[in-house]
Amino acid sequence: MSKVIKKRVETSPRPTASSDSLQTCAGVIEYAKSISKSNAKCIECVTLNASQYANCSSISIKLTDSLSSQMTSTFIMLEGETKLYKNKSKQDRSDGYFLKIKVTAASPMLYQLLEAVYGNITHKERIPNSLHSLSAETITEKTFKDESIFINKLNGAMVEYVSTGESSILRSIEGELESLSKRERQLAKAIITPVVFYRSGTETKITFALKKLIIDREVVANVIGLSGDSERVSMTENVEEDLVRNLGLVDIDDEYDEDSDKEKPIFNV
């Protein structure tokens, strides 16, 4: 087992937002814009349609003609501090795990999706009758929680382990959930797709499903070095020997009980 010590790299401050501002339609749109690296127009319009579930509306995205002609998908890429958690009370269910991403960068698709959805609600267009009573001014918006997006729809997703100068390793996430949940928080990219627009009274959010997680294949631990500084120590020797699965420190918050008094993701849809 190699232990290659890497000094922590200082990064520029990430955009921040107050909890109150992230719970307004205007606030969440502005925050999504602040973490977008581009303002290139991607979305022509969004339509919300009634579904078999009273509280859920399906989401139909129409991309701009130039993107549609290139057969571009409506997937959204995010980057941020990522951690996979267990739901202790749901180990026998498909949502026994969920992903928390503290987003530091996002595709412009994200803010344009939010902008289009709440623009529709404001103008009472391209929405089902069940949403006509909503006012964008009084909505409590829950897509972000603590500047993070929570994703519990993981079925069918892939995980790609990457390492500089070496071939990446692609696997189905189903076989990686246990080992990923034992990793510490680390920077990763995620490709997600919107699932439904969820409403409960005046609380709303867009829910997402994970399509792909792109993560450094090294398992690292944050330790306090001899000088008192925080250092990141590589704990992985060879992914092909499955050390990526079997090594890693269990984070203190590794298991998350939705029935406990802890804060939890809202709208498990």
From Swiss-Prot:
Entry annotated with the keyword DNA-binding: yes
One cellular component GO annotation, for this chain's record? host cell cytoplasm
Source organism, top-level taxon: Viruses
Q: What is its main location?
A: host cell
InterPro entries the UniProt entry points to: Poxvirus_I3_ssDNA-bd
Q: Name one GO molecular function term.
A: single-stranded DNA binding
Key words, A-Z: DNA condensation, DNA-binding, Early protein, Host cytoplasm
Query: To which protein family does this belong?
Result: Belongs to the orthopoxvirus OPG079 family.
Q: What does this protein do?
A: Plays an essential role in viral DNA replication. Binds to ssDNA with high affinity and localizes to cytoplasmic factories where nascent viral genomes accumulate. May disrupt loops, hairpins and other secondary structures present on ssDNA to reduce and eliminate pausing of viral DNA polymerase at specific sites during elongation.
Q: Which protein are we looking at?
A: Protein OPG079
Q: Which organism is it from?
A: Monkeypox virus
